[in-house]
From Swiss-Prot:
Subunit structure: Forms homooligomers, possibly octamers. Directly interacts with POLD1, POLD2 and POLD4. Interacts with the N-terminal domain of WRN. Interacts (via UBZ4-type zinc finger) with monoubiquitin and polyubiquitin. Interacts with TRIM14 and PPP6C; these interactions positively regulate the RIGI signaling pathway.
Catalytic activity annotation: ATP + H2O = ADP + phosphate + H(+)
ZnF UBZ4-type: positions: 17-44
Localization in the cell: Nucleus; Cytoplasm
Cross-link Glycyl lysine isopeptide (Lys-Gly) (interchain with G-Cter in ubiquitin) mapped to chain: 81, 141, 225, 301, 310, 316, 322, 335, 482, 627, 633, 636
Compositionally biased intervals (Low complexity): 130-155
Protein name, entry field: ATPase WRNIP1
Enzyme class at the top of the EC tree: hydrolase
Length: 665
């Protein structure tokens, strides 16, 4: 069976929903990252809602609920509530719901905390890593938002309210007391953070130290723009982890360095750097007076493309200027829209750079594809993710705490105003890098959310406990970053490719009778938020295609599993699927029927000329005329014979063909 075709079930496509951790809005999992980019712009830090995750943290003995612990239950109402999603690849998840099964939680926990290999720290010797100079990037360049924050900009809501609180409470308790009361904190002020704050020398009842401003500064930097955008590199020097595509000795790199840009299709999973590479090409081409025009296939119309082409023609003929046209998500253009570029790419009016998360062999016109070089970008490796995160952490002036040196925090207990106000555990950086699953945008968004949520929860705690608001010496722990990530849409590709890869791996593992691998691929899909009914439908197919008559009850099992999933939904139905998958992996296999049927189909498709008529004796003869024409004549009614009947059932010209013996006609 081929499992690479799109899964198009509009009903199910409405179910694959996740919740935005900032605005709490439900949406298709595929949209969460782009939504977060917008949402972070719209919602100031004080409005982020870390409490949702934190509440769960309080309710569950095992600590904060990992994002991936979101459970789904299929229900009609959930389906009705959700808007339809545009593509099937983005479909198929139900409403998030907390699972309460202990065993299940345990397995998720182990997923959430991937071990660092042999306990080694991954944080590299980044040029500016662990420096304590707030607000500066590795390059020494300060992000615009930081610069603005440093100036006499209007004060934010949080800042003003914090000041008010301070005035109301007076010169009250400091952070030291906060530690003691940590258990009352509805937010994130958990034991480890309190401990660390004490270790930093944050105890004592003094007023907030001027260092608090640095935390404010960080918050303002993050409020203005998604961190992923702020950190988007302009040069290949800051572009990490894609050495196969643009490493030192690659053809593409030399072409970029000599500014000979061919038409390109950049293919890779979300957040791996497709747009960023185009951005780097753009920065480079501007230096060489090449026009760089960007369109997104999600909203551009064919006319927009025509306009760009027309202008490119003018620029070429009047000013001898080249135009590079970057089309994000090019797979969203249909075939005829893609045809619009074809002659213009061919004659060099435009250099096309398309970015796609989908396999271009299926999604991009063959003719267009043959005129472009396909660059395959991969999920960013963990080391590259750490480097990217460290670049951001340094630009925010956040200090990384070395967990192998427990005295480290103490060394920051002086009152120097140049000290960093915010700290992050090194293992938190590692965890973020792991859980981001090669998606730099997800990692940077996760970092941004963790920082904002930490600042915001600290503020909430101060408000509740009547203490003065002092965002100085805030510690970001591993748990904070886990909450900053929505694991369900990170471990499992929301754009489609991984969806088909995983179901294909499951199918092949069952076919190969590998029950371990079968269970692994099943869990990987379900834990990633796959729709259980999608998996169940595939099992129904497998039952006939691969097991067939070797064990006809497999089909009954699969249909029962499908119905069971339909009745009880996730998380309860996962064990039904697991049982079925293991049954199938262990079952004897037979493709006899499947291949014989394929032989019949091939026979029909390859037939030249009109198909042979149905033999007269096999035809029904409900009227006299038909009887007169010979319909049904000579037909031997089998029940009337005690012996096997010698009778031909195939058309005359197929006599002797045996589809079960691989004979094709
Ligand atoms: N290789 C990389 N090196 C450094 N930073 C990166 C890299 N890849 C991505 N990033 C960071 O992640 C952010 C998102 O990356 P980008 O927009 O390029 O992803 P994409 O592959 O185009 O994703 P999508 O398919 O979802 O549009 C960038 O703004 C940048 O900050």
């Amino acid at each position: 069976m081929e499992v690479s075709g799109p899964e198009d079930d509009p009903f199910l496509s409405q179910l694959h929903q996740v919740q935005c951790p900032v605005c709490q809005q439900m949406m298709p999992a595929a949209h969460i990252n782009s939504h977060l980019d917008r949402c972070l712009l719209l919602h100031p830090a004080g409005h982020a809602e870390p409490a949702a995750g934190s509440h769960r943290a309080g309710e569950r003995a095992k600590g904060p609920s990992p994002p991936g612990a979101k459970r789904r239950r299929l229900s009609e109402s959930s389906a009705l509530k959700q808007p339809a999603t545009p593509t099937a690849a983005e479909s198929s998840e139900g409403e998030g719901e907390e699972g309460d099964d202990g065993g299940e939680t345990e397995s998720r926990e182990s997923y959430d905390a991937p071990p660092t290999p042999s306990g080694a720290r991954l944080i590299p010797d980044f040029p500016v890593a662990r420096s304590s100079s707030p607000g500066r990037k590795g390059s020494g360049k300060r992000p615009a938002a930081a610069a603005a924050a440093g100036s006499a900009s209007p004060r934010s809501w949080d800042e003003a309210e914090a000041q008010e609180e301070e005035e109301a409470v007076g010169d009250g308790d400091g952070d030291g007391d906060a530690d003691a009361d940590g258990e009352d904190d509805p937010g994130h002020w958990d034991a480890d953070a309190a401990e660390a704050a004490t270790a930093f020398g944050a105890s004592g009842g003094g007023r907030p130290h001027p260092r608090a401003l640095a935390a404010e500064e960080i918050r303002q930097m993050l409020q203005g723009k998604p961190l992923a955008d702020t950190m988007r590199p302009d040069t290949l020097q800051d572009y990490f982890g894609q050495s196969k595509a643009v490493g030192q000795d690659t053809l593409l790199r030399s072409l970029l360095e000599t500014n000979e840009i061919p038409s390109l299709i950049l293919w890779g999973p979300p957040g791996c750097g497709k747009t960023t590479l185009a951005h780097i090409i753009a920065s480079n081409s501007k230096k060489h007076s090449i026009r760089f025009v960007t369109l997104s296939a999600t909203n551009a119309k064919t006319n927009d493309v025509r306009d760009v082409i027309k202008q490119a023609q003018n620029e070429k003929s009047f000013f001898k200027r080249k135009t590079i046209l970057f089309i994000d998500e090019i797979h969203r253009f249909n075939k005829s829209q893609q045809d619009t570029f074809l002659p213009h790419v061919e004659c060099g009016t435009i250099t096309l750079i398309g970015a796609t998360t989908e396999n271009p062999s299926f999604q991009v016109n063959a003719a267009l594809l043959s005129r472009c070089r396909v660059i395959v970008l991969e999920k960013l490796p963990v080391e590259a993710m750490v480097t990217i995160l460290m670049r951001a952490i340094n630009s925010l002036g956040i200090h990384v705490l070395d967990s192998s040196r427990p005295t480290d925090p103490l060394s920051h207990s002086s009152n120097s105003s140049s000290e960093p106000a915010m700290f992050i555990e090194d293992k938190a950086v590692d965890t973020l890098a792991y859980l981001s699953d090669g998606d730099a945008r997800a990692g940077l968004n996760g970092l941004q959310l963790a920082v904002l949520a930490r600042l915001s929860s600290r503020k909430m705690f101060c408000k509740k406990s009547g203490q003065s608001y002092s965002p100085s010496r805030v510690l970001i722990t591993e748990n904070d970053v886990k909450e900053g990530l929505q694991r369900s849409h990170i471990l499992y590709d929301r754009a489609g490719e991984e969806h088909y890869n995983c179901i294909s791996a499951l199918h092949k593992s069952m076919r190969g009778s590998d029950q371990n691998a079968s269970l692994y691929w099943l869990a990987r899909m379900l834990e990633g938020g796959e729709d259980p009914l999608y998996v169940a439908r595939r099992l129904v197919r497998f039952a006939s295609e691969d097991i067939g008559l070797a064990d006809p009850s497999a089909l009954t099992q699969a249909v029962a599993a499908y119905q069971g999933c339909h009745f009880i939904g996730m998380p309860e139905c996962e064990v039904l699927l697991a049982q079925c998958v293991v049954y199938f992996a262990r079952a004897p296999k037979s493709i006899e029927v499947y291949s014989a049927y394929n032989n019949v189909k091939a026979c029909l498709r390859n037939h030249q000329g009109p198909l042979p008529p149905v033999p007269l004796h096999l035809r029904n003869a409900p009227t006299r005329l038909m009887k007169d024409l010979g319909y049904g004549k000579g037909y031997k009614y089998n029940p009337m014979y005690s012996e096997p009947v010698d009778q031909e059932y195939l058309p005359e010209e197929l006599r002797g063909v045996d589809f079960f013996k691989q004979r094709r006609c």
